[in-house]
Amino acid sequence: MKLNIMKISGFLLSLKSVIFINFFFRFKKILNKDLKIIFFYFPVKSYQDNIIELIDELKKEKNIEVILGYNLGSSDQVKKLDKTFFLNLGYLKYIKKIDIFLSSYVVYEFPESINKIYINHDISDAPWVNPENEKILIKTISKYNYIFLSSDIAISDLKKKIDKY
């Protein structure tokens, strides 16, 4: 019973977030044609301090609106910040017309955005997924417009994986 309540709660919170993000921020863009909307998504609990610092810097800019999405896996770290929305992974595709989508974790479905950015924090060539899922991961990564990697080792490893598939 508790699991069903969690699922229903997650659905309702995600639905509320999708509606609010799509209408409120679209309205803000109508009022300010130069406004750029950047959506940071935090699907898992991991080290995020450097991304939070980036968000704080971006919020100082005049024509940039930063919004944050989180789910149960990352709620403790993110939900207390300004302009945050609960959004389960499957609901990202319902977010429309944002300028930049950014995540430090590979997501397989994206919101409608001009630019999709993946920031990887691994500094080694450790496997990202099981070998049987690697092809799907690389295919998904190829959908990102920009990929930021933290070391030459990680860059070399990703190039090899892309060449392989």
Residue ranges, per PLM feature:
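Active-site and donor-binding regions of nucleotide-sugar-utilizing enzymes
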Residues: L35-Y165
